[in-house]
Every structure is written in C-alpha cells, then in structure tokens.
Curated annotation (Swiss-Prot):
It is found in: Cytoplasm. SUPFAM superfamilies: Nucleic acid-binding proteins (SSF50249), Translation proteins SH3-like domain (SSF50104). Its main location: cytoplasm. It comes from the Eukaryota. This is Large ribosomal subunit protein uL2. It comes from Drosophila melanogaster (Fruit fly). GO terms for cellular component: cytoplasm; cytosolic large ribosomal subunit; cytosolic ribosome; nucleolus. In larvae tissues examined: gut, brain imaginal disk, salivary glands, fat body, muscles, epidermis and trachaea.
Length: 256
C-alpha cells in the first residue's frame, strides 16, 4: 500500500479551517441599513494597513453609529488613491468619487467600480483582488437590473440595488514583479495556505505517487485514468476525451 498522495490530502475530509492566524479581519462593506438606503453616512479613513496573505491593502474606516453613541470601525478594501484623513460617504445620495460606496442605480454607465455585491446586502463579493475593477455597462429601469463587466471579461446582470465602491483596487501590478527566489515564494505561501512547493509526481518514489520511481524520470504507463478510479490512483489526465497535441486547423483544408 502506497502513501496518501497530495490529491488525497487536500481533498474532502474533516471541516476545513482557513489559515487566518495573522489576518487583520474580514474586509466588507457596511451592513446595509436605513442610513444608506435613504441618504448617506460619512466615515473617515484612519489607517491604511497590510493584511498578510492578501495582495490589496485595507483601509480602517471609522463611522459614527447613526443609532447609538458609538464609533463603528469597518475594514474596507482600499481603492487606488485613497489616503488617511479622507472622508468616505456610503449611501444612495453619496457623490461619485473614489472610495465612496453607492448602489449601482446611482452610477452612470462606464463607471469603474470594485468590491461589488453579488446579492443585495452581501457586503461585497466581486472585483476585490489588487488591481481589479468592474465596469458598469448598462441599466435596465424596468427590471431594476444592471449589466456589469467583471475583471474576467464576463458580463453579469445583477440587481441595481447592489452596492459597490467607486475606483480600482489598490496594489495593481503586484504580479508583474518576478518572485525570483524560493525564499520569497516560501514567505508568500506561508501566510496563504499549504500549497507550495509542488513536487512533480515523476520526481517521487513509487511508494509516494503512481508516477514515481524508475531509473529516469518518466511516467512509465498511460497517464489517462478513468473517472471512477480510486483516490490514490486518480492522477494525470482524468477522464480525458483526447490527449496529445491539437494538429491542423480550420484553414488547413487543401481543396481551396
């Protein structure tokens, strides 16, 4: 019997526990309340902080609670251009400027947004990674829906009552800088999850992986496996319809 391979270790098992030991907290928009639905509420950016394991910086924003004598501290994903001391306005009657949070219905077409809600009141789900943004494409007044273009290029229709922050997420160009050495990759993934380094199966011993062993690094058998293969053997090209290079193309017909 071989060892438990990597695919089995990372697969289904006990309840997943996220790696959040040094994280600063969950970055979300304010809870949707009467103040935001009817008018606006003002906050002030107290600090811009780094969150380990996250590419984008976070903004610590203080709001005065509209219902009781208390200061509410919120963690927002910081857009490009936000600074400490800046006033942030959240609500239907907020102005269109970087860092403000508004419903999509109040934004003109072509507005660049980030931290967009997928469902009304979920406090931000889309376009949250460093340098990412979504674009408001069109509003439908009859159905109260808005069409947005996501960072992937896909178009999505969401309710016009969904909120979003105006601007581009800060930290753009982060992946342009090469990692260059293993030490930096080690520290990068140490705060994220146990996903590095990735050792190839052919570089292992036969007890550790189905592709391991041999006097030189080769798989030694067909790398295609069927869909119902047992967990420890299910590596390689799983339930592949075809393998190999795709040769030729549509314009290759000889009888032109």
């Amino acid at each position: 019997m071989g060892r438990v391979i990597r695919a089995q270790r990372k697969g289904a098992g006990s309840v997943f526990k996220a790696h959040v030991k040094k994280r600063k907290g969950a970055a979300k928009l304010r809870s949707l309340d009467f103040a935001e639905r009817s008018g606006y509420i003002r906050g002030v950016v107290k600090d811009i902080i780094h969150d380990p394991g996250r590419g984008a910086p976070l903004a610590v924003v203080h709001f005065r609670d509209p219902y009781r004598y208390k200061i509410r501290k919120e963690l927002f994903i910081a857009p490009e251009g936000m600074h400490t001391g800046q006033f942030v306005y959240c609500g239907r009657k907020a102005t269109l400027q970087i860092g403000n949070v508004m419903p999509l219905s109040q934004m003109p077409e072509g507005t660049i947004i980030c931290n967009l809600e997928e469902k009304t009141g979920d406090r931000g789900r889309l376009a949250r990674t460093s340098g990412n943004y979504a674009t408001v494409i069109a509003h439908n007044q009859d159905t109260k829906k808005t069409r947005v273009k996501l960072p992937s290029g896909a178009k999505k229709v969401v309710p016009s009552a969904n909120r979003a922050m105006v601007g581009i997420v800060a930290g753009g160009g982060r992946i342009d800088k090469p990692i260059l050495k293993a030490g930096r990759a080690y520290h990068k993934y140490k705060v994220k999850r146990n996903s590095w380094p990735k050792v190839r199966g052919v570089a292992m011993n036969p007890v550790e992986h189905p592709h391991g062993g041999g006097n030189h690094q080769h798989i030694g058998k067909a790398s295609t496996v069927k869909r119902g293969t047992s967990a420890g053997r299910k590596v390689g090209l799983i339930a592949a319809r075809r393998t190999g290079r795709i040769r030729g193309g549509k314009g290759d017909s000889k009888d032109k």
